[in-house]
Design a protein with these regions (language model features):
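A contiguous, mid-domain pocket- or channel-lining segment that forms the substrate-recognition surface
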Residues: 80
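Acidic/polar active-site rim loop that often engages polyanionic ligands
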Residues: 98-108
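Active-site loop segments of alpha/beta catalytic cores
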Residues: 1-31, 35-40, 50, 54, ...
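Membrane helical hairpin/interfacial module
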Residues: 58-73, 77
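Loop-to-helix transition at the N-terminal end of transmembrane alpha-helices
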Residues: 44-48
């Protein structure tokens, strides 16, 4: 049973020879090649090499394009900071939507427009070429509250839930459209599964989660399923 067969069978509830092994690796994968993590985040060829080497060395059943949470925000125009040996970071005190009125004029970037999203899509195409017959290929997008926080600033967004609920709904609706466009191109490029990172959901209580976050996570997952993709939701 190949890794690909194992994961697909398990997802469909069929017997497998062992449970699939699909741990998230980012900086660990870069270490396997001796690459700077900055290069892992910005050069799809470095990411692909690190993922494949890690999967082969440790018996993983998949490869993954996750490197940091800033791909989509950077392409939207958000200021980000690059480091030699840690993930790309959003600069919260310069948040793109510090002025929330800018949301009305914010354009969704083209995932194939040569930016960081495009870099991730190129990684998927290379994964498909190199290991597509054997491994499951997982793309990555940000969830509604995670990307909303990347664009607005996490601390400001937490106050928006109380101070301006309609804005939060508008922001999350924008995020869902952005992420579904990105997911569509990732699936076309070769992704079998779309991972959704929505870590900021763990920072709110159940009332806020059910009113604001859950409905948009559901729309996002349903949208990816409608595109023919499988979904893995990651809330760390």
């Amino acid at each position: 049973m190949t890794s690909r067969e194992r994961v697909l069978a398990h997802l469909e509830g069929r017997p497998v020879d062992r449970l699939p092994l699909m741990p998230i690796t980012m900086m660990f994968a870069a270490v396997q090649t001796g690459a700077r993590y900055r290069d892992y985040c910005t050069d799809y060829r470095v990411l692909v090499e690190g993922q494949i080497r890690t999967a082969e060395a440790f018996g993983f059943d998949y490869v993954n394009t996750m490197s940091d949470p800033a791909r989509e925000a950077a392409d939207c125009g958000a200021p980000v900071e690059y480091f030699e040996s840690q993930p790309v970071a959003l600069i919260e005190d310069q948040a793109l939507l510090a002025d929330k009125t800018k949301l009305a004029s914010l354009k969704i970037p083209d995932p194939l427009g040569g930016g960081r999203m495009h870099n991730g899509i190129k990684a998927l195409a290379l994964f498909k070429e190199r290991v597509g017959k054997d491994k499951i290929i997982e793309g990555w997008i940000e969830g509604p509250i995670a990307e909303g926080a990347d664009l607005r600033g996490i601390n400001t967004l937490m106050m928006d839930f109380f101070d301006d609920p309609p804005f939060v709904h508008d922001l999350f609706a924008f995020v869902i459209e952005l992420e579904l466009r990105f997911a569509r191109e990732q699936l076309k490029a070769g992704a079998d599964v779309i991972g959704v990172g929505d870590a900021a959901a763990s920072l709110v209580g159940p009332d806020i989660y059910h009113e604001f976050v859950w409905p948009y996570e559901k729309k996002l997952v349903d949208g990816i399923h409608a595109l023919g993709g499988k979904v893995r939701l990651h809330i760390c």
